Amino acid sequence: MELQRAQRNLKFLQNEDYVNVTDQTNLNGESQNAYSLGMETQVPEMQFSLSSDDDSISTQVKSVTAQKSPITQETTKNDTERNKDVDKSCNPVSTSQPDLGESNIEENIFINTQIQSRLDDAEEETNLKLKLEKFKYSFKSSNADDTHSNANVTAKRRPAIRKANSKLKTKPKTKRDPKIIKNITDFNINNYERSRTASLLKQLSGKHKKVLDIIKTQNEGNSDKPPRARNNKGEKATFDTYSEQEWKDIMKLLLQKFPQSEETDLNEVQKFLYGSEKSSSSLDNQESSQQRLWTASQLPPELPDEAIQPEQEERIRDTQSAVNFLSLSQVMDDKSEIMKDEESIIISRGDSTSSQEYGNGLEPQQPVGNVVGEDIELAVGTRINAFSLTDYKACKPMSVEVSRRCENSTDNDYDNISIVSDTTDETSTLFPLDQYRYVFIENDERPPLATDTIGSTQFFTPNTSPLDGIIDLTQESFKAVRSLISPLKVENNKTGVTSQASNQVQVPATRTPTIIPQKNLTTTLKTEEEKNNIGSSIRVKLLQESVVKLNPKLVKHNFYRVEANDSEEEDTEFDDQFCIADIQLVDSSKISTKDSTQNPTTSNDIIDTSAASSIASPEKFCEIMMSQSMKELRQSLKTVGLKPMRTKVEIIQSLQTASQILSTANPDNKGEHGGVANFSKIEIFDHLTELIEAFPDFLERIYTFEPIPLNELIEKLFSAEPFVSQIDEMTIREWADVQGICLRNDKK
């Protein structure tokens, strides 16, 4: 350390001598004081530098050699270092050292370590810049030399990817042969003389619009001709027509060209086609000929001669395989199975029911009064119009006289009418149908009817036969029913009705749902009296004479005439003597009033208790509501079909108003329901039905299945009853579905 100090002091001394020699006049007292201060405050160097380890090692080696070498060598080294410092100070690039006038003095000033580190960083940065500038200036100089040397030479610009300049070899143009077929369609048309329309019709088979357009263009003109220019004025084309005289001339020419025939020739042709009987009248009467042709087309085929009948009968009897069949009309007319249980009710004679023939086997009846005469014929031809296509004997009007039946009743072993010839030469025997239908009944010989306590009545009792529930088209017109009963197992009539009912399945036959509410919109078709007296009366079929004898208070005077439901039913003179009357039943309330008059004390007690219960019912209802929890009240709202409410008070008010409205609308159902709400959803449905019945225009739309907007239906119901606003929308939809009302969601 001391050695280094000594070396540095020696360096300063040498520098001072040099400065004094060069510029002695510039020194003053202040510079000397600063120099003295620098000497006094000089700190020994701690060898902190930013240079590499090699530099530090070299400095140490130099210091060691300096100790061994003489002083002269140290002086020379100091001189070289001084020259280097002078060059650095004179270099304009170095900006890290401040210019205080003397560069050597600045190095001797004591500086803080932090400032010194920053200065070292700046010095290192300048050194690096100098090293980099060496390359910078050399690169610029080389570029400058190149530009100067190559200034007169212009570089060629070439694309990165060169395109191939290979030219495609073009084929030499050759003339086309005119014999080559360009279009096969034109070739076929020209060679085979087919029209353009026919060829296109073949190609465009099935495309009617294109075909019609093609035909239209063909009809308008030849396609070979150039199309005519359209008339700018839009005038329609005019055509020449024949006048009346020209038409007459054309008719004469046509008549002269074609041969004429006389009326006798036409009559011969008609005789050959239709026979001699049909051509007896002349053809001048056009109406008679048309009527004759119409009647001839409607008449059944003629019967064969009487000589052929025995041969036909023998052939029928000799046939071994007889096919038993019935036509559809015969099946519909057959009441032998359905009416088996009602034969005892139908009025008929015992000897008439024993006959097995359809028309010939009927035994003669005794004429009584003006009811049945000897010359009265029983026309049953209308009953067997359905047999005319199969039975060759059904074509003749089957008029059976009562007097002739006695004469022809000797041979009743075989019936010719029941034989039907099949197209395959097979025959069969028809089943007997309804023997009692064409039998006239006399008033004197009428057997007693099944009577009731009221008098001589005939009730429409439900049928208990296995075919019950099947629609009978001969007895009533076709109409949709609510359900069809299909028996799974046919049992005998001797067994009980309960066993048969257990084996029946209900199949819905219409769009009405299987769950039918208590009320339906069909009740609106009834009168008010019928609505009020639905359960208090019974409708029966009675003789008008017996109805007059009954009490007029019990029987209504609006009688209904008995009409045949089927158009093919035969009307008899006894139909006017029967009528259908509504007889009022005994009211149970009147009986209870009579009993109450007998026991006045008990009746008074009952009245008092009922009045007390009716008075206390709203309070009890409110107490029951308040005692229930919110969960139970909300559940009751959901089951009944009302809108959900938030608070308990609103729920109770909604249930109270609903119970009051429904109790006034249906007073008979009061107190039937238990639990929180004393009404059900079905009662709400009934109330909505009553509200909608007040609008006939709305009912007409419902009956015609017109889609009705839901909001319009709700507004209609709300106008009649504001309580509808508290009913849930899903409840209204369910009610509409049950009643068959078509709804839609749009608000149009």
Curated annotation (Swiss-Prot):
Family: Belongs to the SLX4 family.
Feature: compositional bias, Polar residues: 57-75
Region (Disordered): 50-102, 215-236, 277-303
PTM remark: Phosphorylated by ATR (MEC1) and ATM (TEL1) upon DNA damage. This appears to be required for the function with the RAD1-RAD10 endonuclease.
Annotated S-S bridges: none
MF terms (GO), sorted A to Z: 5'-flap endonuclease activity
Protein name, UniProt field: Structure-specific endonuclease subunit SLX4
Keywords, comma-separated and alphabetical: Cytoplasm, DNA damage, DNA recombination, DNA repair, Nucleus, Phosphoprotein
InterPro entries given in the database record: Slx4_ascomycetes, Structure-sp_endonuc_su_Slx4
Keyword Iron included in the entry's annotation: no
Modification Phosphoserine, positions: S289, S329, S355
Compositional bias ranges of the Low complexity kind: 277-291
Summary of subunit composition and partner proteins: Forms a heterodimer with SLX1. Interacts with RAD1; catalytic subunit of the RAD1-RAD10 endonuclease. Interacts with RTT107.
Entry function: Regulatory subunit that interacts with and increases the activity of different structure-specific endonucleases. Has several distinct roles in protecting genome stability by resolving diverse forms of deleterious DNA structures. Component of the SLX1-SLX4 structure-specific endonuclease that resolves DNA secondary structures generated during DNA repair and recombination. Has endonuclease activity towards branched DNA substrates, introducing single-strand cuts in duplex DNA close to junctions with ss-DNA. Has a preference for simple Y, 5'-flap and replication fork-like structures.
Upper classification of the organism: Eukaryota, Fungi, Dikarya, Ascomycota, Saccharomycotina
Main location, first listed in the record: nucleus
Keyword presence, Zinc: no
Compartment annotation: Nucleus; Cytoplasm
Compositionally biased residues, Basic and acidic residues: 76-88, 222-236
BP terms from Gene Ontology: DNA recombination; DNA repair; DNA replication
GO cellular component: a single term: cytoplasm
Modified residues (Phosphothreonine): T72, T113, T319
HAMAP family found in the cross-reference section: Endonuc_su_Slx4
